[in-house]
Amino acid sequence: MQKMNIGTVLFDQSKGAAVVTLVEEQGERVLPIFIGIWEGMAIFREINRTASPRPVLHDILYNLLQGFQARLEKVVLDAVQESTYYAQLYVTQQDLTMIADARPSDALALALKFQAPIYVTEAVLATGGKRADFAVGEELREEAQAALDTSEDVRAWLENVRPEDFADPQ
């Protein structure tokens, strides 16, 4: 298993989709995962520590787990079938550990909320991981950081976005 960090979240409103990239902490591989736009916004908000106007799923799960004095110890992406990734949540409460199946988008948002480590199995990386050219990766990271530094418009949009904004114009 390889420890991963969340790299970027990219949005394509025309397709109603987002891509979250996981970057190998001690290596050169990147794992892109296609997710829904709402899930992408939840992860983007967690990265930027921007609260949602109303609690979303990972906020509710976080509050419940905290209330039961449980903790998310780690997230493991352990399978991919027909381009669908699978994640496991490792939750502990005292001496008890429970493993729960989760969508990667929810698992990643929870990992950010709990500041829990994210791991990906070698089998999953072998299937979907891409080798990242370090220079290009560093250039993209700098561009992404510059975009985040000037993202007040995006933050304002995220705070005010409504479901109707994505309605079919027909």
What are the residue ranges of the model-derived segments?
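Divalent-cation
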Residues: 1-170
